[in-house]
Amino acid sequence: MHRKHLQEIPDLSSNVATSFTWGWDSSKTSELLSGMGVSALEKEEPDSENIPQELLSNLGHPESPPRKRLKSKGSDKDFVIVRRPKLNRENFPGVSWDSLPDELLLGIFSCLCLPELLKVSGVCKRWYRLASDESLWQTLDLTGKNLHPDVTGRLLSQGVIAFRCPRSFMDQPLAEHFSPFRVQHMDLSNSVIEVSTLHGILSQCSKLQNLSLEGLRLSDPIVNTLAKNSNLVRLNLSGCSGFSEFALQTLLSSCSRLDELNLSWCFDFTEKHVQVAVAHVSETITQLNLSGYRKNLQKSDLSTLVRRCPNLVHLDLSDSVMLKNDCFQEFFQLNYLQHLSLSRCYDIIPETLLELGEIPTLKTLQVFGIVPDGTLQLLKEALPHLQINCSHFTTIARPTIGNKKNQEIWGIKCRLTLQKPSCL
């Protein structure tokens, strides 16, 4: 078998004149395209082009110039543009996202978790406006996050009502100025926040009903700012420090609707702080925690408290070593008392605890550290109608009760959260 030699290609650098003529029968175009599974590009209206991503930022701006279409030169027979045919809406029935009313889109957005809501806010200006609607930002949980204070301020400006943010980090100063927040329930317990930053955030809050600042360092300006929230019902300042008895008096005198107050273990509390607390706490209070003041809480303070707050239901005076069994008569003056905590009040004689069993309304009694383990069972048998040493921790004014899986804040479940979101 003889191989056929390839024809030599002329050298372009030579002087030999060479010309090629390309030709195509336009009648065969449709046959070729059909074999390829495509069709020729149909003419479209100018406004039916797909909007490129880079123009999304211009949506909603009428002054934005329209795009110019390139005009082809020459006749249609010179070349053919081939691309996939545009989907015909008649063959794919449905409703365009652009035609959906705002109310329906808001309903869809309300089913999204926080990461997805942030994503859709970047689609276009309309979606950004809808994703920022205050109805979607009623409850927000950013527990344990490292946040810039300005970001926190912007989020609260969205219309957040319940803000759960314990154990968070906001160790930078607040730079921006914000309009008043609408937040009513806020938990910043055990967070790392600069005093000036905390003051900047709280200064924009005047509608608070429930607030927990447990473990934070405060200041007189912060406490005086809190006094603007006259609708406070629950206030947790357990373990706080940095404010005087004068600021405390201003706060308690202004918050006349308090129902639960936790002032336990405030590090730099003195006898004067305790005296101010019992003399100015709201008369409407039903749950009060004044534990941890050892020698600073006297029997006279208890007498003042009982006279001022006859509606107490839950009272915690644990770690008050100056209280003895001669103060028991004060508890009999509280006609609604159900829960009493006297743990580690070491001057109380264990045998005298039987007297407390005669309080008709009493249901639970916490006396850890007073009754030896050997006689605890005897006490329980002598007072069978009481639950004794049934709880190690207080729940007074605490925002979250139970295990760490509980993501509620005073019974309100936060919808927007970054804690393992379950997106649709």
Swiss-Prot record:
Subcellular location(s) per record: Cytoplasm; Nucleus
Keyword Acetylation: yes
Modified residues (N6-acetyllysine): 68, 71
GO cellular component, one term: nucleoplasm
Modified how: Phosphorylated on serine and threonine resudues in response to DNA damage, promoting 'Lys-63'-linked ubiquitination of NBN.
Cross-referenced InterPro entries: F-box-like_dom_sf, F-box_dom, Leu-rich_rpt_Cys-con_subtyp, LRR_dom_sf
Residue numbers spanned by region Mediates interaction with IFI27: 402-424
Region described as Mediates interaction with hepatitis C virus non-structural protein NS5A: 1-220
Modified residues (Phosphoserine): 64, 72, 75, 179
GO biological process: cellular response to cell-matrix adhesion; defense response to virus; G1/S transition of mitotic cell cycle; G2/M transition of mitotic cell cycle; innate immune response; positive regulation of double-strand break repair via homologous recombination; positive regulation of intracellular estrogen receptor signaling pathway; positive regulation of protein polyubiquitination
Complex and partners: Part of a SCF(SKP2) complex consisting of CUL1, RBX1, SKP1 and SKP2. Component of a SCF(SKP2)-like complex containing CUL1, SKP1, TRIM21 and SKP2. Interacts directly with CUL1 and SKP1. Interacts with CKS1. Interacts with ASB2 which is the substrate-recognition component of a probable ECS E3 ubiquitin-protein ligase complex; ASB2 is likely to bridge the formation of dimeric E3-ubiquitin-protein ligase complexes composed of an ECS complex and an SCF(SKP2) complex. Interacts with the cyclin-A-CDK2 complex.
Protein name stated in the entry: S-phase kinase-associated protein 2
Native source species: Homo sapiens (Human)
